[in-house]
Amino acid sequence: MRAQRSALVLASALLVAGPAQQAEATAWEKAKFAFHLGAAYYAFNTWVWRPYREYKFQTGAPSQRANIVKAGVALAFAAYQVNTAVKMTRNTQDPFLRRIGSLLPGFNKSLTAVGNDLKRGRFNEAGIQGLNRQVNTLLNAAERQGQPIRPVAVPIPGL
């Protein structure tokens, strides 16, 4: 009788813990996904889009070549982060991650292509503008699905 009771308690605990673990995994997946895309967006915005808007890639700009190479390295980092996010969305059951993840492979290819040009010191204005359009498409798609993604500047003490 005691063995049956222990088996019943164990089975009940597993039935309750199973869905709870899945819910935690989904929250953890979303947090990791947001981290990777956030890191990619930060690299793009800080080292590519902002200098582009400030004309730091134009001929004759001070440190033009260095800025272009930095942008290329930043896009390589962003492509790695997006690739990690794509891998996460392949096996997830979360509908939001699956939908947003379906938009990422094309974005990753664009990041890599423009990044390779910039790392070689070749300025690709159309590519940078295209990347910005793709970023806005991703942000709008997330908002349409009820998960708005807003860039937030987080102050780091001492910097």
Regions found by a protein language model. Name each.
Residues 1, 18-19:
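Intrinsic low-complexity/disordered segments
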Residues 1-9:
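Bacterial N-terminal signal peptides that target proteins for export
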Residues 9-18:
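Bacterial N-terminal signal peptides
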Residues 19-25:
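Sec/Tat signal peptide C-region and signal peptidase I cleavage site
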Residues 26-36, 56-70, 89-99, 120-130:
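Non-transmembrane, amphipathic alpha-helical segments
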Residues 30-53, 106-159:
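C-terminal amphipathic alpha-helix
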Residues 40-92, 103:
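Alpha-helical segments in soluble extracytoplasmic regions
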